[in-house]
């Protein structure tokens, strides 16, 4: 079981980082297609980079769930994993920029990959410890879906933050 879990985490990390990298360029590759804009990065904002992590994590979660049906706390762990990733990207980005003033592109790329690695290590640890009780897995899944809806809505109508 331990080897199976490590293989899942490694495969997930590879697929999520590959998917996020593809999504980073997909909008430009399609000539700014409105069909891919909810899922891909339409500009270089931190928000758009959070989408690049969210969508591959969500798709991988749907596939992985088919193989982890016996994991009762699955969706709660997935929600915690996604929330951690969505918090880490802006925290790491703004911390780096706050300290050094500006971040080169390679730092932004490193932040994405480091965040992906940390969320997969976190998820592996959460499943291994099995201490996150999940009384309402459907609510956790609904929260994940709501995050996806917010990414779509805010892609087309971003909030005006002063």
Which sequence ranges carry the predicted segments?
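Hydrophobic cores of alpha-helical transmembrane segments in multi-pass inner/ER membrane proteins
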Residues: 51-64, 113-124
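N-terminal membrane topogenic signal
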Residues: 1-12
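Terminal transmembrane helical module of multi-pass membrane proteins
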Residues: 127-162
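Alpha-helical transmembrane segments of multi-pass membrane proteins
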Residues: 15-32, 152-159
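Small-polar-interrupted transmembrane alpha-helices in polytopic inner-membrane proteins
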Residues: 20, 24, 60-61, 77-94
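Membrane-interface helix caps and helix-loop-helix hairpins in membrane proteins
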Residues: 71, 95-106
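Short aromatic-rich membrane-water interface segments that cap or initiate transmembrane helices
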Residues: 38-51
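Hydrophobic alpha-helical membrane segments
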Residues: 85-89, 108-124, 145-150
